[in-house]
Amino acid sequence: MALVIGVTGGIGSGKTTVTNMFEPLGIEVVDTDLIAREVVQPQQPCLEAITQRYGPQILLADGNLNRKKLRDIVFADNSERLWLESVTHPAIRQLTVQRLRAAKSPYVILSSPLLLETDQYTLTDKIVAVDVDEAQQVERASARDGQSVEQIQAIMQKQITRQARLAKADYVIDNSHTLEHTHSQVQALHQTFTMLATAIEQK
């Protein structure tokens, strides 16, 4: 398997902005947010389990999952959140491993908001934290998702703290300034990771 670089960050940190900058450099990105959506598509076992638990009212008219309704349920009851994770996390991990193994680029990015909160970090060789301060997280996430400040803060409370994330990271990208500033950091890390991948290949 290629060298795996985990990229994580709190809600509103701009993690996806950063990982999107690696793709034009020829680097494959495995995004667990997208995989999490795949495993609850119609006809998938995870969606069938969710429908059995909450009934057909958890679905939209077209048969897709009503994400807002499910999100409201799991935020209101921690036991429901734990149940949902017990159903979806194994499926997400299985598909994530398949995609990482199939990657053909010199190294591969594993993008995950819960990299350090779950066992996904065990799939990585190095970890990059995308960092902004908490006030920027709330402002950006609210503008992007239209969620209330309370909902965003509830998500932040379920994620590892900013300090703990930075302590566990091998590299940090400061995403609090301009896109150009972020891009220059990505370019520098790309050089580092390419050299690391080459060194591993030559062993």
From Swiss-Prot:
Residues 4-200 form the DPCK domain. It catalyses: 3'-dephospho-CoA + ATP = ADP + CoA + H(+). One of its GO terms (molecular function) is ATP binding. Pathway: Cofactor biosynthesis; coenzyme A biosynthesis; CoA from (R)-pantothenate: step 5/5. It holds the Pfam family CoaE. It is found in: Cytoplasm. One of its GO terms (biological process) is coenzyme A biosynthetic process. Keywords: ATP-binding, Coenzyme A biosynthesis, Cytoplasm, Kinase, Nucleotide-binding, Transferase. It is an enzyme of class 2 (transferase). One of its GO terms (cellular component) is cytoplasm. Catalyzes the phosphorylation of the 3'-hydroxyl group of dephosphocoenzyme A to form coenzyme A. This is Dephospho-CoA kinase. It comes from Saccharophagus degradans (strain 2-40 / ATCC 43961 / DSM 17024). The lineage of its organism: Bacteria, Pseudomonadati, Pseudomonadota, Gammaproteobacteria, Cellvibrionales.
